[in-house]
Amino acid sequence: MSDYKKTLNLPQTAFPMKANLAQREPEAIKKWEAANACAAMVEASGSEGTYILHDGPPYANGHLHMGHALNKILKDIIVKSRNMAGYASWYVPGWDCHGLPIEHKVEQDLKEKKKSLPAHVVRKLCREYANKWLDVQRKEFKRLGVLGDWDHPYISMDPAYEAVTAGELAKFVAAGGVARAKKPIYWCCSCHTALAEAEVEYNDHTSPSVYVRFALPDEGLKKVFAAADPARAHVVIWTTTPWTLPDNMAVCLHPEFTYALVEAEGSQYILAEELVASCAETFGWSEYTILDRATGERLEGLKARHPFYDRQSSLVLGLHVTLDAGTGCVHTAPGHGREDYDVALKYGLEIYSPMDDAGRFLPAVEFFAGLNVFEANPKVVEKLEEVGALLQKGKIRHSYPHCWRCKEPVIFRATTQWFISMEKNDLRTRALKAIDEEVRWIPAWGRERIHNMVEFRPDWCISRQRQWGVPILALLCEDCGEAWNDPAWMQEIAARFAKHPTGCDYWYEAELKDVVPEGLACPHCGGNHWKRETDILDVWFDSGTSFAAVLEKRPELGFPADLYLEGSDQHRGWFHSSLLVSEGTRGCAPYRAVLTHGYVVDGDGRKMSKSVGNVIAPQELIEKFGAEIVRLWVSSVEYREDIRLSDEILGRLVDAYRRIRNTCRFIMGNLSDITAHDLLSLDRLQPLDRFALDVAGRVHERVQQAYMDFDFHKVYHTLHNYCVTDLSSVYLDILKDRLYASAPHSDERRSAQTALWHILCLLLRDMAPVLSFTAEEIFSHLPESLRGPETTVFALPPLAAAPYLLDEGTRDDWNVLLAVRGAVTKAIEPMRREGIIGHSLDTRITLFVADELRQRLEGLHTDLRAVCIVSQLHLEALDRAPQAAYRDEEVAGLAIGVEKARGEKCERCWIYSTELGSDASHPALCPRCTAVIKGMES
């Protein structure tokens, strides 16, 4: 027997079957860096305009976690897909470097020494710490295959950035939008600083629950309730923060609620009528009588007595009082609550909050001096019992605010802070209008979420009592304590930041005379003794100015951005602060669209936690699977929800990746001997190959649209199904005979190769944004004669699908043929199961077809036998079909007869022929193979 295998055109390619991703990916990264692939990608783009994705800066602290990986890969997919679609898109990564977490780490290292060090020394250590982790994270991001301007990122501690941040605050001051006031704000007693809404997390917490009676000896009570006895009367409050009772200034009632005067156990009590029954049960009153009723409005101005201090607590009115729980009478401590503060302003009550930065009561606070607020809780309860003011005590488990950094419970504390007003210049109204009318929110529920946050948020507390950040440019009068600043002066100081080697360290290092304007007198008291403000800006103001520091300053970018993309927690963070800063100083949103993703959870849907032990680090996955599989995972999930991750999930994706890779490898293996000169024009392709290009073109359209719509899971599923089903299981399976057994330079083989080349060109463009390493590897293995001048796959120009598409009628006919092919496969299966045949080529098929079906099949002008991968196939009229013929309910007008193929099997192509050996020199070959061999021999 002759060795005819050597005469077959078997696939040949240096593109390896085994990916070895973890080993090969670093080489690809080196290649991208050497070729400046990011610049090459953008420079090759721009035919459709620009697209600006503005990077939300991660915090320069610690190694990357899976949330970082998800976020950066999503951005990378968008930037690459936009560039490859013709939209020039520079990706400028950024880092947020100021703030408490870094200062906290430096504090831990310095311990007690920090207290004696000047601010600029602490700041230098913070800067070094941030720089160290910035470099670590930069390497880790690049390892994920993310292309960007990594050598020129934006960094919030750069002098130019700090100068812009300080300058943006000056613009708010110029517009009258900034005020310094004593208001209750979130305060962390552990970190000794004010907190913004975005820096507060709500967790379950157990608090004391106490019902307290305030004596109401006011004779005016009789004018409201005829049956009242002021000597025995009380108003009852409920609180879960007993430590705030020393600072009580009033009891608040709702003006429209009905309040009852209740007789019980020898005393009289004022409670909201609707809550009397539940309170009686709580207090254990077996009997009680409602003596009279009145609206809260009639009780306004009556004077109660503080439970353990010799002072009055007035009855005041407020619309914030509810009947959801408690008594309908609200303990009011203006130094510890927003509504309490608002009521205090209305009634002229003292904003009383006598505690230090650690939350300890000052020496002047009788009974509780020196106690931390949480230590004071049980002591206050003891005091209430001692004076007979405690009606009931217990515990309550509820959602309570905690510090985002140290995880400790926080308090409301009135301190002097700097605020941006939400009402001045209609900032709130304008921000809400931008949310509703200017910005596209993806998913759509994001609009309502941020709308509600902005609608109900308080004024923005922008000051922090820390050292590592951009200082608030203001001078404090040492004579009267009032603050002074001026927008022009602030801009001048900000300009000095830009020129100083370490930016706003200038504020701490310069002599006082260099920052105080000559001859400046305090406008409040006329004094001229000044000191610098030591508060720094909220880091959310820092990052919220990034549009001004980056988009408006870099010529390759622009304002506003087309897209901000971060986790859903940023509705209250970066999206929120950026909107307020931009709306406040530019009068518009800084973004046209906002896209949010969910959190990464484990395979069971649980939050990743070190304590649970279910944290998965990107570095481990890259080492085990390769970054490419992590990228494929990002593209495969519905990332707008919480995203599950486990080894099992990634294992399934490894299998999917292998199938995609092998499909590409098969295509490349069959292009090894073709040059650009050998490619046929589309009108010379065989009908099957034209249909294959139609399928490829429609897949390309779907994939590109999915990229534009941010539906990356559709990209993954479309490409995977295409490679596995349309290509491997159908088209490539049909092509094998033509590719392997036809004459190497024949039109029928060149037609197949031409189609494969076009398919690969489309596949490369569709894969590259997600499977970046693999696409680059394929690109580097393309035959030299087929390659263009591009240095990277990402610089390939866009390809339109239109030239590949067929008319719908022809496409429908091909789909009918594929349905017939599927029916043939099912008809053959019983003979295969019974061992009568081993392969579909061992069969002869008779298609009994109705006239309409015959016309459709014959109108395709294709080899039906080859499409069905059988040795012989012929058509007969449907009415000649025997009873035993196979019928498929999915294909109308068809019956199938299956029998063993006639003749003998060709040793070269394995197709049966009744004309085997018609040439004596090749007795084991069919006429087709004989002609091919003779052509080779000649």
UniProtKB/Swiss-Prot annotation:
The keyword Aminoacyl-tRNA synthetase applies. GO terms for molecular function: aminoacyl-tRNA deacylase activity; ATP binding; isoleucine-tRNA ligase activity; tRNA binding; zinc ion binding. It holds the Pfam family Anticodon_1. Binds 1 zinc ion per subunit. Its cofactor is Zn(2+). Its EC number is 6.1.1.5. It is found in: Cytoplasm. Keywords: Aminoacyl-tRNA synthetase, ATP-binding, Cytoplasm, Ligase, Metal-binding, Nucleotide-binding, Protein biosynthesis, Zinc. The lineage of its organism: Bacteria, Pseudomonadati, Thermodesulfobacteriota, Desulfovibrionia, Desulfovibrionales. Coiled coil: none annotated. IleRS has two distinct active sites: one for aminoacylation and one for editing. The misactivated valine is translocated from the active site to the editing site, which sterically excludes the correctly activated isoleucine. The single editing site contains two valyl binding pockets, one specific for each substrate (Val-AMP or Val-tRNA(Ile)). The keyword Zinc applies. The gene is ileS. Belongs to the class-I aminoacyl-tRNA synthetase family. IleS type 1 subfamily. GO terms for biological process: isoleucyl-tRNA aminoacylation. Its main location: cytoplasm. This is Isoleucine--tRNA ligase. It catalyses: tRNA(Ile) + L-isoleucine + ATP = L-isoleucyl-tRNA(Ile) + AMP + diphosphate. L-isoleucyl-5'-AMP binds at residue 566.
